[in-house]
């Protein structure tokens, strides 16, 4: 059973709800890709959006299980773009029992002369700070909130702009880098996450970045929706296709 909390005139009311479908989907991804192991110290990348908030909620529930034994905490990288949602985020994480640390940076000041702010630059700077923090504080894994749609959209963007087949791996380890990136939401799509966030009562208290509306990802999302008709089963087929490559019948 999980607790669901909603904001009502500045107060938080909690109720108990059954384990949602989203958590079962995350469990499958975690199991399939061996994302959580005994002794892990996992840093949750808490952007404040519905995806990473749902991910933190999952980890809060997962920590209550007996096995595997691991530790998890969250880091929010606050930027000069704005973090007006932060007070609510802190309260929600505290209620779940997830320690949340906030680090403030200026992504605008880091832009080179003549360059414009975009999704890639902002996200790369936040991941850089996440990696530094993880190494400094003994975390061996960073949990990112990228979901199934993100992965497929990235594959489409790379195929149509770079002419290469590449996306976001569920687990990304490095030979010369001590921190592994994991994406527990890799099998969950946007509608599933939205339904969960609505059910848990935090869909309206999480953030959405305005720069996403002007990015190539918005176009890729539209293409993915047309290609799959928004059906989860077809998205999973595309995801599986990225793993089942028959080179004998390719150029």
Language-model region placement:
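Short, solvent-exposed polar/charged micro-motifs at secondary-structure junctions
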Residues: 111-114, 216-218, 247-250
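A short, charged, Gly/Pro-tolerant segment at domain boundaries
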Residues: 233-251
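Conserved anion/nucleotide-ligand pocket segment
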Residues: 227, 231
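ATP-dependent adenylation/nucleotidyltransferase module used to activate substrates
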Residues: 5, 9-155, 161-164, 191-199
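Catalytic subdomain that performs nucleotidyl-dependent activation
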Residues: 149-226
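Residue-level detector of flexible, active-site-proximal loop/helix-junction positions
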Residues: 79-81, 107-109, 172-175, 188, ...
């Amino acid at each position: 059973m999980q607790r669901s909390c909603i904001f009502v005139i500045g107060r938080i009311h909690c109720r108990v709800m059954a384990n949602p479908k989203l958590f079962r989907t995350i469990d499958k991804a975690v199991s399939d890709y061996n994302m959580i192991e005994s002794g892990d110290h996992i840093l949750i990348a808490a952007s404040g959006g519905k995806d990473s908030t749902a991910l933190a909620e999952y980890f809060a529930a997962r920590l209550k299980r007996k096995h595997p034994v691991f530790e998890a905490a969250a880091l929010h990288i606050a930027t000069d773009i704005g973090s007006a949602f932060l007070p609510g985020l802190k309260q929600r994480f505290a209620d779940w029992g997830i320690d949340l640390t906030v680090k403030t940076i200026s992504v605008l000041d880091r832009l080179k002369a003549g360059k414009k702010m975009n999704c890639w630059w902002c996200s790369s700077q936040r991941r850089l700070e996440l990696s530094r923090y993880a190494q400094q504080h003994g975390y061996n894994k960073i949990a990112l909130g990228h979901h199934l749609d993100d992965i497929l959209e990235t594959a489409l963007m790379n195929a149509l702009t770079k002419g290469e087949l590449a996306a976001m791996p569920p687990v990304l380890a490095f030979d010369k880098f001590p921190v592994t990136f994991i994406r527990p939401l890799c099998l969950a799509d946007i509608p599933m996450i939205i339904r969960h966030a609505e059910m848990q009562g935090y869909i309206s208290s999480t953030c959405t970045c305005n720069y996403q509306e002007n990015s190539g990802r918005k176009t890729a999302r539209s293409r993915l929706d047309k290609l799959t008709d928004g059906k989860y089963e077809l998205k999973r087929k595309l995801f599986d296709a990225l793993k089942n490559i028959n080179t004998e019948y390719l150029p």
